[in-house]
Amino acid sequence: MARPKIALIGAGQIGGTLAHLAAIKELGDVVLFDIAEGTPQGKALDIAQSGPSEGFDAVMKGANSYEEIAGADVCIVTAGVPRKPGMSRDDLIGINLKVMKSVGEGIKAHAPNAFVICITNPLDAMVWALQQFSGLPAEKVVGMAGVLDSARFRHFLSVEFNVSMRDVTAFVLGGHGDTMVPLVRYSTVAGIPLPDLVQMGWTTQEKLDQIVQRTRDGGAEIVGLLKTGSAFYAPATSAIEMAEAYLKDQKRLLPCAAYVDGAFGLNGMYVGVPTIIGAGGIEKIVDIKLNDDEQAMFDKSVNAVKGLVEACKGIDSSLA
């Protein structure tokens, strides 16, 4: 039985990290694609040469032609321009929309049956555009957002409570940007909701509010520290978690930027919501109930995403 084929579109920091993680976890053979000649080939060769020490047999290949991604089971898209200090994710829309058009056409022509995970920012608008350009079924095109944002939230909570990250669950919904909605009420430590932990004296509401805001600013904090790029380790591990759920039919409940039509009162748009990922792609949207405050924050985030989608339509008339 042939191993699954994983195509990584973009051989930058995230793409290279994705390739390494996919190999270590033996998720399948990897094609690392980039328009820059030599870059994907060099990284693929470097990672392949770590195989004897790390004990994996996955085949690594670098490519500059979309023909090399033919028949891919999973495509993870990182291609585009990363943020720099002072930039918001939304500042990237014009440049990266053109990239999504090229990528979408490449996937449509050579890997139309793939499960596609988009990482390129501004995430919610780019995954929508990628689905439009590729023509793939909406349940097979998803954005990596909530898994990363929730991981950041979980990390900050584990540090605050001095407990293992394995015992912290957290949900972040909405757009992957400044209006994201970390759901305190649905987040727990070993099953104990965060509001109860405040009442128990484990932390204060003020500290919890600070953690929520730091989660929203999580990407910008790293951009400010690196100065020359954006995060890549955590985004890559988040996307690999999603890819593994699909390839192994794990039925994982993961927050992702998915196409929502009916749930949460939304009609046909991409935004971060709880999903079930299995062999069918996005197999279910988990329509959790929000209180008035949560709904107001979610609505604000949805409106921000709608604004980005309208901006995309203004830039490329084929999307209108």
Curated annotation (Swiss-Prot):
Domain of life: Bacteria
Known catalytic reactions: (S)-malate + NAD(+) = oxaloacetate + NADH + H(+)
Gene Ontology biological process terms in this record: lactate metabolic process; tricarboxylic acid cycle
Catalytic residues identified in the record: H176
Keywords assigned by UniProt, alphabetized: NAD, Oxidoreductase, Tricarboxylic acid cycle
CDD domains: LDH-like_MDH
Binding site for NAD(+): G10, A11, G12, Q13, I14, G15, D34, N96, I119, T120, N121
InterPro entries noted in UniProt: L-lactate/malate_DH, Lactate/malate_DH_C, Lactate/malate_DH_N, Lactate_DH/Glyco_Ohase_4_C, Malate_DH_type3, NAD(P)-bd_dom_sf
The EC number(s) this enzyme carries: 1.1.1.37
Coiled-coil ranges per UniProt: none
Pfam families: Ldh_1_C (PF02866), Ldh_1_N (PF00056)
UniProt keyword annotation of NAD present: yes
Regions that span the bilayer: none
Residues noted as binding substrate in the record, renumbered to the chain: R83, R89, N121, R152
GO MF: L-lactate dehydrogenase activity; L-malate dehydrogenase (NAD+) activity
PANTHER family: L-2-HYDROXYCARBOXYLATE DEHYDROGENASE (NAD(P)(+)), L-LACTATE DEHYDROGENASE
Function: Catalyzes the reversible oxidation of malate to oxaloacetate.
Family, per entry: Belongs to the LDH/MDH superfamily. MDH type 3 family.
Protein name (database record): Malate dehydrogenase
Organism, as annotated: Cereibacter sphaeroides (strain ATCC 17023 / DSM 158 / JCM 6121 / CCUG 31486 / LMG 2827 / NBRC 12203 / NCIMB 8253 / ATH 2.4.1.)
